Amino acid sequence: MFFVLSPAKNLNEKDPCPVSEFTQPDLLAESEILMRQLRELAPQQIAELMHVSDKIALLNAERNAAWHTPFTPENAKQAVFMFNGDVYEGMDANTLNTNQIQYLQGHVRLLSGLYGLLRPLDLIQPYRLEMGTSFANLRGKNLYEFWGGIITNLLNDTLAQAGSNTLVNLASQEYFKSVNTKKLRARLITPIFKDEKNGKYKIISFYAKRARGLMVRYAAEHNITDPEMLKNFNYEGYAFNDAASNESEWVFMRSEQIK
């Protein structure tokens, strides 16, 4: 069983990594192709392409200029500790023990606009390139066309090597669109997290993102290899709702949070 997650725009570059083990991204040669083109963009072009402020555009122009291989622990950081959004706050990998970190490395993959598909301990250098960005490139008009079948093929190889036939999709639609589900050789399960608000259950983005990270943490802490065991996920008040679920979409609900 493998999980796929989205990356995060917010990055934690400063805090030291709690583990020394690292791996290298499998698709780094592809990243270098993209980065050569990204480096050609002036800050104003980055601002327009990514719809960000001048300050963020300048930061990322500087990141692009500084980006270089080979990646080492001195100039890069393991992806699961670099990404710093809601999903990763829910996962809170910094407080997992060594065995649990190894679980992440063996069962979790992170989708990325620049790096394609990452293991949690793959070294990465800071960047900003969301998968949905309309970044025209050598292979097409956007990143979905750039990556083509590359991410799906690597996922299939990863699943086959592990003898796994289940992929749990905890990524956003923007990122999971980079996976060709018709060519994916695995059973696909998509957990959906709904919170009660004013008596109705619906997806609330912040809570849903955090819950995705919490589910990965739950799996790591319980060393889960059987997908059915994920139905016992109960962190922070969530509970599996069988009536609202089907074979491929598993719905977890939580009663309204009393502030």
From Swiss-Prot:
GO process annotations (BP): response to hydroperoxide
Residue ranges of the TM segments: none
Taxonomy, superkingdom: Bacteria
GO CC annotations on file: cytosol
UniProt-listed NCBIfam families: PRK02101.1-1, PRK02101.1-3
Family statement drawn from the similarity comment of this UniProt entry: Belongs to the UPF0246 family.
Protein name (database record): UPF0246 protein NGO_0461
